[in-house]
């Protein structure tokens, strides 16, 4: 699993996540205790999601303690019910806790299952993450809008966390992160990968010059991937994953963000985390390179053929069908009924 801060979920929390994903739980509060992610509180289903939202969410938010809240919506996707992920980081909480919770956010989503999360919100005051705040958030996602107070606070937290000056000339900061410029050879490598003339790119941040540099583009098989992951520094990787799926031959670009946890400085961890989303935006929007899967790891040993396949083609949740009642002989079933009983023809009512 990916644990950029060395923090991971307890067995009890993982078990509760599994239970919650079946739809019986409305809310999960997660906190960090003794360097572990633990269950802080939970709420069972009661009424419609929007009716219970403020009554369930707001009382659980401490004015001095960050936390994560997962709130189950009533909509569903192929993997089951969709969830809202809330990162709560109040103004009065210590900077150290803000940094810790910010750096562990990706781990919580991965532990729960990112495919179940429909929306994310960040809040420093309760109004930001209230039902009204969420509705404004959904509206703002459909069109560009000025930064909210919470978004401005998130920017400032990131600036404080990395403890580095940000000049207008060197990079641009938005809610999505920092934008270090791609060096020319890195841009050329991305174009070459798009043309499928190479199958691997490794990039690194130059923390002094504030640029994204090309490390190498060595030909790489799946068996070589673990050796490409440095054990003492972070990297960005693009890999052209050639494989077969359901009888079709596919060539899928996979983005890998490797971060070996505490072996890197806080500044390095925060800068790599902040630059990642802007790099991906640039690659996908400006270079028009389609990325099939984005993966975060802390150890190259995770990159097996089976792991890559499961990440690119996640197994769908199987829904057990009701037992199909056998049909009687043709022509001897009596008069046709207007309303079918539950379970008939193998369908639930």
Swiss-Prot record:
Transmembrane segments: none annotated. The keyword Kinase does not apply. It is found in: Cytoplasm, Cytoskeleton; Cytoplasm, Perinuclear region. Gene3D superfamilies: Severin. InterPro entries: ADF-H (IPR002108), ADF-H/Gelsolin-like_dom_sf (IPR029006), Twinfilin (IPR028458). Interacts with G-actin; ADP-actin form and capping protein (CP). Actin-binding protein involved in motile and morphological processes. Inhibits actin polymerization, likely by sequestering G-actin. This is Twinfilin-2. It comes from Gallus gallus (Chicken). The lineage of its organism: Eukaryota, Metazoa, Chordata, Craniata, Vertebrata.
């Amino acid at each position: 699993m990916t644990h950029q801060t060395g923090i991971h979920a307890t067995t009890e929390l993982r078990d509760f996540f599994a239970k919650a994903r079946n739809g019986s739980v409305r809310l999960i509060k997660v906190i960090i205790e003794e360097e572990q992610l633990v269950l802080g509180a939970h709420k069972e289903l009661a009424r419609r999601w929007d009716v219970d939202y403020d009554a369930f969410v707001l009382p659980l938010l401490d004015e001095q303690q960050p936390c994560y809240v997962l709130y189950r919506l009533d909509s569903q996707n192929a993997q089951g019910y969709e969830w809202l992920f809330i990162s709560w980081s109040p103004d009065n909480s210590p900077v150290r806790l803000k940094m810790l919770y910010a750096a562990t956010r990706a781990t919580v989503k991965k532990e729960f299952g990112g495919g179940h999360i429909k929306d994310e919100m960040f809040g420093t005051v309760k109004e930001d993450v209230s039902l009204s705040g969420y509705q404004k958030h959904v509206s703002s996602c459909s069109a560009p809008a000025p930064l909210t107070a919470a978004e401005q606070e998130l920017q400032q937290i990131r600036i404080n966390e990395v403890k580095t000056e940000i000049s207008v000339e060197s990079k641009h900061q938005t809610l999505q992160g920092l934008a270090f410029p791609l060096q020319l050879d890195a841009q050329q490598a991305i174009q070459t990968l798009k043309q499928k003339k190479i199958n691997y790119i490794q990039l690194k941040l130059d923390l002094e010059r504030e640029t994204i540099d090309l490390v190498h583009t060595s030909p790489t098989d799946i068996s070589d991937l673990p050796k490409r992951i440095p054990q003492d520094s972070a990297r960005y990787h693009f890999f052209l994953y050639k494989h077969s799926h359901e009888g079709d031959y596919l060539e899928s670009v996979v983005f890998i963000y490797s971060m070996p946890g505490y072996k890197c400085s806080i500044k390095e961890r925060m800068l790599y985390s902040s630059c990642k989303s802007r790099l991906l935006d640039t690659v996908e929007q400006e270079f028009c390179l389609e990325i099939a899967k984005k993966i975060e790891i802390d150890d190259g040993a995770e990159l097996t053929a089976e792991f890559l396949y499961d990440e690119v083609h996640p197994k769908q949740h199987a829904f057990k069908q009701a037992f199909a009642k056998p049909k009687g002989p043709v022509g001897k079933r009596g008069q046709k009924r207007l309303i079918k009983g539950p379970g008939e023809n193998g369908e639930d009512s």
